[in-house]
Amino acid sequence: MDIRESRSQSPELSQSEDAVGPCPFLISVYHQFQTKNHVLDIFEDVIPSIQVYGWLTMTLYELGVLIADQLLLNNEETRHSEWSLQIRTIFYDKYKDRPIARDLGTVCLHNPKLFQGNKLLKRTGIKCGDKIDVTIKEDKIRIKK
């Protein structure tokens, strides 16, 4: 990166170099098997959660893989790819003065192209500080053979 001094003695970045990349942010992920969490339980922190770092340029499938890596793939009983993750964002709406939940999509771990796996996080409207609620279900279509 070429840094040149200007007359004000503050460094200027050269226009020929692009930025290194977007900044990651911490995402609080609240999870439960088979059912959705209640919105108020998420804001009261009574539900188990994990923390993952994410980027706005990542897809829902990539977020699902990060979540599965911490929750599912470390346990011998749940170490298979036949899982579907229903992802929604939880945020506090200051105009309505209450928490709001909005579905982002469903991700299948065995195929990133199914459902909304290719959707970018920045296209979903998620912002820093929003919480993620994940419902983890076995993919019944793939398990029945």
Swiss-Prot record:
Main location class: cytoplasm
GO biological process annotation, one example: mRNA cis splicing, via spliceosome
Entry's localization field: Cytoplasm; Nucleus
GO CC term (a single one): nucleus
Alphabetized UniProt keyword annotations: Cytoplasm, Nucleus
Family of this protein: Belongs to the SAP18 family.
Protein's recorded name: Uncharacterized protein C126.13c
Species annotation: Schizosaccharomyces pombe (strain 972 / ATCC 24843) (Fission yeast)
UniProt lineage: Eukaryota, Fungi, Dikarya, Ascomycota, Taphrinomycotina
